């Protein structure tokens, strides 16, 4: 998180099949050896004018000396409530998770699966920011790539992030293309396919 010392806001538009359908915005508050990040995510997928999939989510995470100590989120997915309450237990040196799809412990090298944090590309496990589930992941470096965003060209490192367990059902599998700006360690773009072509 020290890489993000000067950053106050990261705004991400969410595209599906080339059309903007929502946003995921991160707001940073820096203190003495602490960082707090608030995230607001909203999008709706419509088919013939009818909403077939929607997310409305708020999350709050806290870091002390670059280490995650707290995460809380509330999400409505198609009006179904999901949640995560996570805290760091110093005596066990573990994350304690109370989530809508997982209750238990996770190793402290697990990363919350949020796109502001480039450390997701180094982690072996990610914790779902919506439900608290813990998934093993494998990250592969594809190569250097020039990409264009909003009329600007960026030299990026292109990575593929996939689930370690390939036996998971397709809707539970991790399968993302991620483009990282190595200069400032910011993830510039994320793409995946699920009910259409998605980009953040």
List the predicted regions and their residue ranges:
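Hydrophobic, well-structured mid-protein blocks that either form specific transmembrane helices
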Residues: 71-113
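Acidic, serine/threonine-rich low-complexity disordered tracts
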Residues: 2-89, 119-200
């Amino acid at each position: 998180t020290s890489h993000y010392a000067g950053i106050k806001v990261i705004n991400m538009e969410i595209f599906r099949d080339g059309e903007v359908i929502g946003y995921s915005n991160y707001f940073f508050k820096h203190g003495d050896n602490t960082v707090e990040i608030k995230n607001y995510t909203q999008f709706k997928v419509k088919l013939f004018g009818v909403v077939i999939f929607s997310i409305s989510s708020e999350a709050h995470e806290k870091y002390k000396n670059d280490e995650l100590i707290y995460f809380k989120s509330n999400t409505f997915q198609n009006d179904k409530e999901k949640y995560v309450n996570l805290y760091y237990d110093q005596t066990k040196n573990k994350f304690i998770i109370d989530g809508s799809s997982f209750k238990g412990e996770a190793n402290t090298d697990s990363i919350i699966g949020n796109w502001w944090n480039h450390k997701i590309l180094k982690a072996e496990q990610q914790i779902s920011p919506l439900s608290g589930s813990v998934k093993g992941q494998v990250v592969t470096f594809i190569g250097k790539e020039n990409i264009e965003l909003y009329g600007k060209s960026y030299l990026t490192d292109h990575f593929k992030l996939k689930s370690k367990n390939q036996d998971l059902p397709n809707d539970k599998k991790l399968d993302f293309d991620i483009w990282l700006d190595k200069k400032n360690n910011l993830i510039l773009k994320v793409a995946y396919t699920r009910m259409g072509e998605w980009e953040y």
